């Protein structure tokens, strides 16, 4: 019998990059797209690798940056994952509460 494996990936913007003044786009490019001088190695690359082997992954997405950047940034993360047939689950980093504007 083959070994069953559950592949998951924490998918989140960097609170440290935010603290250092990175724009939402720069944070997305670094943290989600995984942009490097050698190419992109983020969630798109990860899904490509999984799909090349007939696999699907589970991406644990942190929605908390929406408190700072708005909901669209989370939609931009979740959309490609779901459109490619992968799974999205909840992953939370509460430090974003410290950055959220007060009501």
What residues fall within each predicted segment?
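Catalytic alpha-helical scaffold of carbohydrate-active enzymes acting on polysaccharides/glycoconjugates
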Residues: 1-103
């Amino acid at each position: 019998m083959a070994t069953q494996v559950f592949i998951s990936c924490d998918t989140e913007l960097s609170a440290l990059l935010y603290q250092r003044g990175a724009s939402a786009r720069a944070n997305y490019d670094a943290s989600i797209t995984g942009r490097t001088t050698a190419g992109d190695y983020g969630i798109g690359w990860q899904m490509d690798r999984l799909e090349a082997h007939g696999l699907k992954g589970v991406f644990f997405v942190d929605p908390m940056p929406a408190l700072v950047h708005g909901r669209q940034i989370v939609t931009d993360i979740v959309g490609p994952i779901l459109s490619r047939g992968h799974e999205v689950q909840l992953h939370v980093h509460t430090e974003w509460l410290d950055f959220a504007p007060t009501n």
